[in-house]
Amino acid sequence: MQYSEDRIDQEPGMVLVVEDDEDIAQLLCYSLRKKSVPVAIAHDGLTAFALVEQLRPALVLLDIMLPRLDGHEVCRLIRSHPDRDLAGTPVVMLSALGAPQDIEKGMELGANAYFAKPYSVKDVVAATMEWLGTGEGNQ
């Protein structure tokens, strides 16, 4: 996992899980809901970006290899959005692309953190809870 220097201090809020693998999406959502985190799911990049604009999530868990629009482009669209609050939405990339250059690209595009698959769902949830400011990281 890699983090950027930009951390946030905000109240817990809704997390948008963007993952085309239904099993992984459901596991992430189940694990977050167990921590009382509201979640929404998108299975492709176009839907994900539309939901970011509509729902204004507190954080986006974003797969990279997605149908219709890849995660890199979704992150680019979020970061270049004219609404500066929306453009600052924390993005945590989740990807099978785990080579150093892949992680570097994700971070350069504006990801706040990057988990390479296979990642521990427990670690992703703990990091999410830290980003949301709940102090429940490893509980």
Describe each region flagged by the PLM.
Residues 19:
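Conserved acidic carboxylate
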Residues 112:
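Short, glycine/charged-rich "phosphate-handling" switch motifs in NTP-dependent
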Residues 55-61, 66:
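Active-site beta3 strand of CheY-like receiver
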Residues 26-34:
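Charged docking surfaces used in two-component/phosphorelay signaling
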Residues 36-43, 51-52:
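Short hydrophobic/Thr-rich beta-strand motif most characteristic of the beta2 strand and flanking loop
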Residues 1-16, 122-139:
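Non-catalytic signal-transmission and effector/linker regions of two-component phosphorelay proteins
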